[in-house]
Curated annotation (Swiss-Prot):
Keywords: Cytoplasm, Ribosome biogenesis. This is Ribosome maturation factor RimP. Disulfide bonds: none annotated. Belongs to the RimP family. It is found in: Cytoplasm. Required for maturation of 30S ribosomal subunits. The lineage of its organism: Bacteria, Bacillati, Bacillota, Clostridia, Eubacteriales.
Amino acid sequence: MSGKVRLEDRVSAWAMPIVEELGLELIDVEWVKEGGNWYLRIFIDKEAGIEMEDCQEVSRRIDEILDREDPVAHSYSLEVSSPGIDRPLKSDRDYERFRGETVRITTFAPVMGAKEHLGELAGKNETSILIRKNDEEMAIPLTQVSSVRLYPGF
C-alpha cells in the first residue's frame, strides 16, 4: 500500500469542520470524470433541507482551502449540493433517521436471487441492513452492499 490518501478523504477532512460549524452534515465527497471533465462534488444536508446559501458558503470556504492546498494538478469543477431525493445512506445516523422509508439496496453479487432490493428500511446492525419486503424482513449482508439510497418511488 502506498500510503497515499485519496482525494475524497482529504477533502472530507477539510470539509467536515466547515459543515459542522454551519450546522450541516457532510453526506459524501466524490471525485469523478464525466465527459472528459473532472468534478469534485461535495454533498451536504440538514434536517430542514439545504438552501442555496448553504451550498454557496461551503463552496466559498472549501475553495479557499483547495486553492491553498492545491491537491489536483489539472483543472476541475467544484460542485456543492444537496444529495437529492434519492440520497445515499452512509452513516448509522442516516439509517436511524430514515427508518421506515423506502430504500433501494444494490449489491455486488446476487443476494437472494437479485442484485437490487426495494423495501422499507427496518434498521442496520453490525452485519446487515434490514428491510421489510412483502411483509417479510430481509437481512442484506453489509459485505455484499454496494449502495443504499432512498427510493422516492414516484
